[in-house]
Amino acid sequence: MKRFKYSYFLLIILIIQSCTTRPPENPDNLCLIFKEKRSWYKAVIKSEKRWKIPPYVLMSFVHQESSFQADAKPDREKILGFIPWFRPSSAVGYSQALTKTWEDYKDETGNTRASRKDFADSADFIGWYASKGYYQGFERTDARSLYLAYHEGYTGFERKTYRKKQWLIKVADRVQARSTKYQKQYWGCEKDLKLSLIHI
């Protein structure tokens, strides 16, 4: 009987794992990501049409925020250097959206059933948030500034709160570098990817 219960428990774990979307095998190559995850490409293009944020900018955000992991959360803080404590924020999922900001997104867009662990919803969220900068005069390819505003909020960005956070500036520089890399890759496969949408 115990053996049966153990086998049943393992089966449940395997089922749960199989339902979780795995990160792409080649996270450094945008073309390979989209060829592997066709539904992701479709979601990103849909977000671009709605919010005007390019795929390579959006995907550079996802890479930085969650490494393409659906259930990503901030590491727990530790007491005395080793005792697990609370997480520093309510961020969850591909976009690492905070609970309050996610609720604002759902209210404003009407996407009331949106989940932070769903890639399409997360792609739409990032486009929604970044578009606020685009309509305020940010260049839509300026991943660095858009990311700083994504992290600090647009009010914080205007106040230049990021200037006191050298670590954040370095992260934003990495996001820009990845966006530029993704952009060059995307230009080489965009035509084929768009043709593939016909068969999805």
Sequence positions of predicted segments:
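C-terminal motif of bacterial Sec signal peptides marking the signal peptidase cleavage site
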Residues: 16-18
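Sec-dependent N-terminal signal peptides
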Residues: 6-14
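Conserved small/polar residues in nucleotide/adenosyl-binding loops
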Residues: 198-200
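Catalytic glycan-binding domains that act on GlcNAc-containing polysaccharides
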Residues: 20-194
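Positively charged n-region of N-terminal signal peptides that target proteins for export
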Residues: 1-5
